[in-house]
Amino acid sequence: MSDALLNAGRQTLMLELQEASRLPERLGDDFVRAANIIIHCEGKVIVSGIGKSGHIGKKIAATLASTGTPAFFVHPAEALHGDLGMIESRDVMLFISYSGGAKELDLIIPRLEDKSVALLAMTGKPHSPLGRAAKAVLDISVEREACPMHLAPTSSTVNTLMMGDALAMAVMQARGFNEEDFARSHPAGALGARLLNNVHHLMRQGDAIPQVMLATSVMDAMLELSRTGLGLVAVCDEQHVVKGVFTDGDLRRWLVGGGALTTPVSEAMTPNGITLQAQSRAIDAKELLMKRKITAAPVVDENGKLTGAINLQDFYQAGII
């Protein structure tokens, strides 16, 4: 029984891969035309399709939207019952139908022509009514479905998804869409956390900032170290400009060397220690701490004045790993 299941699964994958392997050679003028129509679209891309094509269409619309192309999915039945009103002349419709003869097209195509909406087709029948009406046809045809009965859309839905990805990625690259653009549309994701957060978004502020003045004694600096638990204290002048840092390591070295606790901390600190700019990207700041093998640092403004403090745990808690 297990061998039969494994063989069926492997056969399905092999058939789907075989059909998908034919897609690259089909990309030509129509693919370029479709991509350019989307690139120059001043409105939105509306993706539509019925059944399994509709399910894949939702994914294609989501991929376009998350990679810099305003897009959404409209079900053909809903389009014919009012949602066509959302479609304007500056929009583009990408209709997915393997047969290219969905009955809804008989009503949708004339309405699109009335509105001068550019129609793109993704179909297995390029010479179907859908293919003939479209400005560009993306051929997703297969010689056979992976379904043993040749009925359930399998190879054809894989081809549809792959063609949609190919189109979305080509448009994305042509737009110059980059990681930061992607992060802006995914602010709650890991990439958004990595690229959108600056140090000032994550740093500790107010009473949570460990700080002392240059004339503060080593004893009082030690108490400040203990109070905040960050492993360092920022040592500032009277204008709150950071002049150095006093760390747990500095304290140990001072005591081992016989230093007095009444001595000003300015004599025991590390002068000109690492500081982070409040406006710098959090991911860059975290990588700097890792590179220098330190766990925390004061945060300063453009004038070097203390505005906060941050440690590696603050980055990790924000999802910046």
Curated annotation (Swiss-Prot):
- Pfam families (alphabetical): CBS, SIS
Q: Catalysed reaction per UniProt?
A: D-arabinose 5-phosphate = D-ribulose 5-phosphate
Annotated Zn(2+) binding lies at H75
What Gene3D superfamilies does UniProt report for this protein, alphabetically?
A: CBS-domain (3.10.580.10), Glucose-6-phosphate isomerase like protein, domain 1 (3.40.50.10490)
Where is the site Catalytically relevant? K52, E104, E145, H186
The residue ranges of the CBS domain are 203-261, 269-321
Query: Highest taxon of the source?
Result: Bacteria
Domain SIS, residue spans: 34-177
Q: Which CDD domains match?
A: CBS_pair_SIS_assoc, SIS_Kpsf
| Keywords, sorted A to Z | ATP-binding, CBS domain, Isomerase, Lipopolysaccharide biosynthesis, Metal-binding, Nucleotide-binding, Repeat, Zinc
This enzyme's EC code(s): 5.3.1.13
SUPFAM superfamilies in alphabetical order: CBS-domain pair, SIS domain
Q: Which residues bind substrate?
A: 68-69, 75, 81, 107-116, 141-143, 267
- What residues does ATP bind to? G49, I50, G51, K52, S53, G54
Q: Does the keyword Cytoplasm apply?
A: no
Give GO terms: molecular function aspect only: arabinose-5-phosphate isomerase activity; ATP binding; metal ion binding
RNA-binding listed as a keyword: no
One GO BP? keto-3-deoxy-D-manno-octulosonic acid biosynthetic process
State whether it acts alone or in a complex, and with which partners, per the record: Homotetramer.
Instruction: Supply the NCBIfam families for this chain.
Output: kpsF, PRK11543.1
Q: Which PANTHER family match?
A: ARABINOSE 5-PHOSPHATE ISOMERASE GUTQ (PTHR42745:SF2), PTHR42745
Quote the function comment for this protein. Catalyzes the reversible aldol-ketol isomerization between D-ribulose 5-phosphate (Ru5P) and D-arabinose 5-phosphate (A5P). It is also able of sustaining the biosynthetic pathway of 3-deoxy-D-manno-octulosonate (KDO), a unique 8-carbon sugar component of lipopolysaccharides (LPSs).
Q: What is this protein called?
A: Arabinose 5-phosphate isomerase GutQ
Which species expresses this protein natively? Answer: Salmonella typhi
Lineage of producing organism: Bacteria, Pseudomonadati, Pseudomonadota, Gammaproteobacteria, Enterobacterales
